Amino acid sequence: MSRVSQARNLGKYFLLIDNMLVVLGFFVVFPLISIRFIDQMGWAAVMVGIALGLRQFIQQGLGIFGGAIADRFGAKPMIVTGMLMRAAGFATMGIAHEPWLLWFSCFLSGLGGTLFDPPRSALVVKLIRPEQRGRFFSLLMMQDSAGAVIGALLGSWLLQYDFRLVCATGAILFILCALFNAWLLPAWKLSTVRTPVREGMRRVMSDKRFVTYVLTLAGYYMLAVQVMLMLPIMVNDIAGSPAAVKWMYAIEACLSLTLLYPIARWSEKRFRLEHRLMAGLLVMSLSMIPIGMVGNLQQLFTLICAFYIGSVIAEPARETLSASLADARARGSYMGFSRLGLAIGGAIGYIGGGWLFDMGKALTQPELPWMMLGIIGFITFLALGWQFSHKRTPRRMLEPGA
């Protein structure tokens, strides 16, 4: 085995272990934020939505800067610093009793994410061969789902005792992750050339095809982020207990572990990437509309199943398409900018979703936020169809198995 092949093989295992630690640390804390501050402390949903939206926007909106800096200085220092910063954010969240302190903790968490997330994504592009990326992204998503359930179960159990224990556990996991990267991650360059920060950013911004694709995905993310805000609130409201939230993530894990990899393997040879992305988005949109009208957990979990199936179809295609479109001379910058759609869509989804949820309750129209999200999903579906029908993306990057 050549040294390059050996490095790629070892890199896969490193990425999988690193990803599991990050997912566990995140999901111990974040699914419980809405339950802690809305249900237990009685805050308005929009206040918590602002906090979650701020974290999302900081982490993803500034990703191009984190990616460009990583292109210049390498992945390791950015990843280690970012993970320590997120640990500090979680520690601060544990003592948050005023909205401004929750917002500050989410700001720190998001800033840490903008440092470590783009270089981690760029390492996947660097280490995994193009023909294997779709399947590797599917493996990461399966791992994300399993980690989400384990993290949510652990967080829900700790929440019975003290929210500070929840945050301390998340902080410790990110400190361990920082030490793991500091010890084992080689000083790899992300790009084929050492690209200056401004040059990497300029290269991305001049790529109109990539910019259009990323911004169009904002609507997709408005739906996707509700697994952190409105879906847990809805489950808690109908069940009458925050313990039921863990079953929502158990459903996601079961579907991902059983369907994600087989669907990705089967569809990658038969359907173009944009068709898989659009099909998944359509299923997600259709499942959102009736959620506000359900009256029991069985109906709600059925719709959540449909939503997750849509995500299982769409996510590997979205990640693979983003990676395929990245310029090898500025991988960090491209993968950082690819998060901008999540920044915009996530911020609007959290803040707008929280506001619509409060508004729906005030007007006794609980279906209002869900209907709006479904409409946004359909608009995004049409926008993606228009974009791809105009051949804005090179055909070879969209072909099955590309």
Curated annotation (Swiss-Prot):
InterPro entries: MFS (IPR011701), MFS_dom (IPR020846), MFS_trans_sf (IPR036259), MFS_Transporters (IPR050171), Multidrug-R_MdtH (IPR022855). Pfam families: MFS_1. The chain crosses the membrane at residues 13-33, 99-116, 139-159, 165-185, 214-234, 244-264, 277-297, 300-320, 340-360, 368-388. Residues 34-98, 160-164, 235-243, 298-299, 361-367 are periplasmic. Keywords: Cell inner membrane, Cell membrane, Membrane, Transmembrane, Transmembrane helix, Transport. Residues 1-12, 117-138, 186-213, 265-276, 321-339, 389-402 are cytoplasmic. GO terms for molecular function: transmembrane transporter activity. It is a multi-pass membrane protein. It comes from the Bacteria. It is found in: Cell inner membrane. GO terms for cellular component: plasma membrane. Belongs to the major facilitator superfamily. DHA1 family. MdtH (TC 2.A.1.2.21) subfamily. This is Multidrug resistance protein MdtH. The lineage of its organism: Bacteria, Pseudomonadati, Pseudomonadota, Gammaproteobacteria, Enterobacterales.
